[in-house]
From Swiss-Prot:
Protein name (Swiss-Prot/TrEMBL): Formate dehydrogenase 1
Disulfide bonds: none
Function of the molecule: Catalyzes the NAD(+)-dependent oxidation of formate to carbon dioxide. Formate oxidation is the final step in the methanol oxidation pathway in methylotrophic microorganisms. Has a role in the detoxification of exogenous formate in non-methylotrophic organisms.
E.C. numbers: 1.17.1.9
Catalytic activity: formate + NAD(+) = CO2 + NADH
Organism: Saccharomyces cerevisiae (strain ATCC 204508 / S288c) (Baker's yeast)
Length: 376
């Protein structure tokens, strides 16, 4: 008889899982933790069937589960209703970063611990942010389409192509990912790096960026915190979103806020899709208010085939730099968050509950972080 049930919800790898054994984040490879869990005397149940609620396999198996593990890339939404139907549930683990798919208020009410593997994919996401910015501002899509279509119209590409140098670039959120984006942007000699966050960056972190810019670019004091979001986006050539999804950030980038942005600015979102209002963003790209929008996160995942971000574009057909949700799930990141999940489970199974403080989102009925719009 097992001590309890662990429910693991991951995306299907299919033939790709057979071809690549490092693809730990798929259901076939189970984060590499099956043997570990079973050695602890627990049962591991895996599924890809997470929707619709309340008739999915997740709903059925969660009813008597003690632990649920899911991922931001293929999230099983642990809603208030699902929590209410799961009396044995004690621990929710996010294989990756970002636990907005869990109803944190309901988890607090039930004193369910919610954890994630903080830091496991921050570099991966920051690199994807940089790639997306460059795809948009350098009009990579326009040039690539000509290359594969047998065309050669230099002016048709160059008319929408710019450098990052001397641009004002900003981030909404300057935490582990946002700061790494700022670090990488210094190399492009920006005019200014702006950030909007509930707290100021440590002086040492700001000085490091300013000193690097002065050393390599001859331009110091480029980093500035802006306290009003409308003021920041109004002066930015590129805006990147690197903050968690919570009640105050949901729908933050809507028609009203976008109206404050520079005409022809670029918007990049690898945080959470629901931070942006999909229809408002698509319309801004179509009208040319935004020169382009890119990222990998969607307000519903998997995104429906008719999602407006799949087909949004501008008149030159170069305003869309969307991908599926891949920024934080490189093979290197998968190795890190798989190990992190194992470490969290080990803390739970040993009854030490000595989780890394930065991995705890809610515990013992209260928030352990301000990242989700809550104070300690």
């Amino acid at each position: 008889m097992s001590k309890g049930k662990v429910l693991l919800v991951l995306y299907e790898g299919g033939k790709h899982a057979e071809e690549q054994e490092k693809l730990l984040g798929c259901i076939e490879n189970e984060l590499g933790i099956r043997n570990f869990i079973e050695e602890q005397g627990y049962e591991l149940v895996t599924t890809i069937d997470k929707d619709p609620e309340p008739t999915s396999t997740v709903d059925r198996e969660l009813k008597d589960a003690e632990i649920v593990i899911t991922t931001p890339f293929f999230p099983a939404y642990i809603s208030r209703n699902r929590i209410a139907e799961a009396p044995n549930l004690k621990l929710c683990v996010t294989a990756g970063v970002g636990s907005d798919h869990v109803d944190l208020e309901a988890a607090n009410e039930r004193k369910i611990t919610v954890t994630e593997v903080t830091g496991s994919n921050v570099v991966s996401v920051a690199e994807h942010v940089m790639a997306t910015i460059l795809v948009l501002i350098r009009n990579y899509n326009g040039g690539h389409q000509q290359a594969i279509n047998g065309e050669w119209d230099i002016a048709g590409v160059a008319k929408n192509e710019y450098d990052l140098e001397d641009k004002i670039i900003s981030t909404v959120g300057a935490g582990r990912i946002g700061y790494r984006v700022l670090e990488r942007l210094v190399a492009f000699n920006p005019k200014k790096l702006l950030y909007y966050d509930y707290q100021e960056l440590p002086a040492e972190a700001i000085n490091r960026l300013n000193e690097a810019s002065k050393l390599f670019n001859g331009r110091g004091d480029i980093v500035q915190r802006v306290e009003k979001l409308e003021d920041m986006v109004a002066q930015s050539d590129v805006v990147t979103i690197n903050c968690p999804l919570h009640k105050d950030s949901r729908g933050l980038f809507n028609k009203k806020l976008i109206s404050h942005m520079k005409d022809g600015a670029y918007l990049v979102n690898t945080a959470r899709g629901a931070i942006c209002v999909a229809e408002d963003v698509a319309e801004a790209v179509k009208s040319g208010k935004l020169a382009g929008y890119g990222g990998d996160v969607w307000d519903k995942q998997p995104a429906p085939k008719d999602h407006p971000w799949r087909t949004m574009d501008n008149k030159d057909h170069v305003g869309n730099a969307m991908t599926v949700h891949i920024s934080g799930t490189s093979l290197d990141a998968q190795k890190r968050y798989a190990q992190g999940v194992k470490n969290i489970l080990n803390s739970y199974f040993s009854k030490k509950f000595d989780y890394r403080p930065q991995d705890i989102i809610v515990q013992n009925g209260s928030y352990a972080t301000r990242a989700y719009g809550q104070k300690k």
